[in-house]
Amino acid sequence: KTRLCRLPEGTFDFLGYTFGRCYSTQTGKAYLGTRPSKKSIKRLIDSIHEQTERRTLLQEATLIVERLNRTLIGWANYFSLGPVSKAYRSIDAYAKARLRRWLCNKHKASSGAYIRYPDAYLYEHLGLVCLPKRTQGLPWAKV
């Protein structure tokens, strides 16, 4: 498990974070920092996929959204340090797409998921948490 690497050039994963070179969005300068590792993002995506499988179609949409929110908020609270905006946006897009697909399967709607269930419906009516908006204004999250 022990591994040596040169930090400016190489990266290493530890406790779900990838440590290595990051770039400032304002100045473009490189600095040593952290970001969520690909493995931790993949694990969260697998969890979202599992929570929105076809076998859960008999459950209420609010229950599914509560479980998704619990998972997303917990993950976002742990991974709130460093440049997380790219990871938050990709996870948010995946969660919205899976929830739309789940709703279409539940209500037997073959097409028109984005028209039938727009973002406003998912966020305001069902109460899905929006990850990119969670950490706006926090100086350490750099979102």
Which positions does each model-derived feature cover?
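Non-catalytic terminal/accessory segments
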Residues: 1-143
